[in-house]
Regions:
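Conserved PLP-enzyme active-site core in the AAT-like
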Residues: 1-178, 208, 212-219, 223, ...
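Conserved glycine-rich beta-strand-loop-beta hairpin in the small C-terminal domain of fold type I
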Residues: 166-167, 186-233, 245
Length: 246
């Protein structure tokens, strides 16, 4: 999982009116857990918009203006958007049915666009009406409302339980007397180079929730602990063959 806020900051430093469309098809659940939430498009957009309005950021921006504008220097420096020019314009698509409770094809478009009313609203609604049905499936729409309600009431508990089950699955595979001879679950340190992990924490969740919080706050890339990646190189078959015949 990348640092959504950082990506947008550095892109807006180059093109201050850039519009972002984030595909969060498998990430709708993230809004409902405090560790995941800052790396969602909508939360990152709100945080960035608030940040750009503060006098402290203005001072920070002016102090960070590069003295050396050579390509090499710019590539090695974290870029910051100009608060006087940058506009936060962010859209995110969620396939709600994939990780929340909704009927198949139930999905949402989320919008945080400072220029929506002025530049986008009319065209957006026209495009939506042009591509949607005049006979919508109200069962799907109702399931979206139910899924949203369930997530609002029970979301944290469900996500936390999901993390616990994922860790139990990792432990079961890694400590199984037979399975562990041929496969193991890849850790953060094995999948993300050290230079992208400022926290230096090799296995964030396994060493405690507080370490997961630290890693997700500091690292440029993090591993979603609810996703289990199993290395099967010692089985003698590749992933495609294993998937097809397993």
């Amino acid at each position: 999982v990348y640092d959504v806020g950082r990506v947008m900051e550095e892109c807006l430093a180059i093109k201050p009116d850039l519009v972002f469309l984030w595909d969060e098809a498998w990430f709708p659940f993230a809004r409902f857990h405090h560790v995941y939430r800052p790396r969602t498009a909508m939360e990152a957009a709100r945080t960035l918009a608030d940040k750009l309005r503060t006098p402290a950021y203005r001072e920070q921006y002016e102090a960070s203006l590069p003295r050396d504008e050579s390509t090499e220097a710019l590539l090695n420096q974290r870029l910051s958007p100009d608060p006087a020019r940058a506009r936060v314009r962010v859209y995110a698509t969620h396939s709600t049915h994939k990780t929340l409770t909704a009927l198949r094809q139930g999905s949402m478009i989320h919008v945080y666009d400072q220029d929506f009313a002025l530049k986008v609203a009319e065209g957006f609604h026209e495009a939506y009406m042009a591509h949607t049905s005049t006979s919508p499936n109200y069962q799907i729409l109702a399931s979206l409302d139910l899924g949203r309600r369930q997530a609002a009431l029970e979301g944290f508990e469900l996500v936390q339980r999901q993390l616990e089950y994922a860790m139990k699955l990792r432990d079961a595979i890694d400590h199984h007397p037979l399975l562990s001879k041929y496969m193991h679950c890849l850790s953060t340190a094995e999948m993300i180079p050290e230079k992208y992990r400022a926290s230096g924490i090799a296995q964030p969740l396994r060493t405690g929730l507080s370490n997961m919080v630290t890693a997700w706050e500091q690292d440029e890339f993090v591993l979603d602990p609810s996703r289990v990646t199993v290395y099967i190189g010692l089985t003698g078959v590749d992933g495609a063959t294993f998937s097809a015949n397993g």
